[in-house]
């Protein structure tokens, strides 16, 4: 009799635990993913991209794809987006290529896409020292003394920048931006050519703001050995090494 009561108690306890776990599962089913879960999913996507761009052997010329693209304003540097914003898929039909470095949604200009992980690393990793040149319209009239700070490196929130090549340049002949840049009529603007040997998030914008001259328009003109040439916004061409 005692043995049977013990068995019944154990069974009841087990049923209670199962019921508890079912209730928790039902409760959590309608909840949005936690920050930790979102981070895990993001890391998986990042690792998948890195794997796709890290072939175990060098690609042959026939296998390698290299695309030069003039990214328009208000376009994401990726092929998918769940919010209906413009992406690379709106312009480029070629599959299995990935952007070597990114451009912010509100930046324009040269984006290089490739399926070659070795080339992607050569263009983006700091130790490779591939130069990236930007044409930057800033608010105000910086003097040489202002630009010297960028040439020697400035300290941003994520640390000091490497010395940059910075020159005042004539206003380039460009396509109109849509929507147009919003100017303040009483304040002049200046165009700068800025060449970096590194690439951090919104680095050029933060650098010009650091010396007191906010960026109004930013166009990447060249990256490594390639430049925009005569590509218009939304146009692309395939090149060979």
From Swiss-Prot:
Stretches with biased composition (Low complexity): 1-14
UniProtKB keywords: Isomerase, rRNA processing
Bias type Basic residues, positions: 36-47
Residues at the catalytic site: 104
One biological process term in Gene Ontology: pseudouridine synthesis
GO function terms (MF aspect): 23S rRNA pseudouridine(2457) synthase activity; RNA binding
Region (Disordered): 1-65
EC number(s) recorded for this UniProt protein: 5.4.99.20
Gene3D superfamilies, A to Z: Alpha-L RNA-binding motif (3.30.70.1560), Pseudouridine synthase I, catalytic domain, N-terminal subdomain (3.30.70.580)
Reaction(s) catalysed (UniProt annotation): uridine(2457) in 23S rRNA = pseudouridine(2457) in 23S rRNA
Family to which the UniProt record says this protein belongs: Belongs to the pseudouridine synthase RsuA family.
Function field: Responsible for synthesis of pseudouridine from uracil-2457 in 23S ribosomal RNA.
Protein's name in the database: Ribosomal large subunit pseudouridine synthase E
UniProt source species: Vibrio cholerae serotype O1 (strain ATCC 39315 / El Tor Inaba N16961)
Gene: rluE
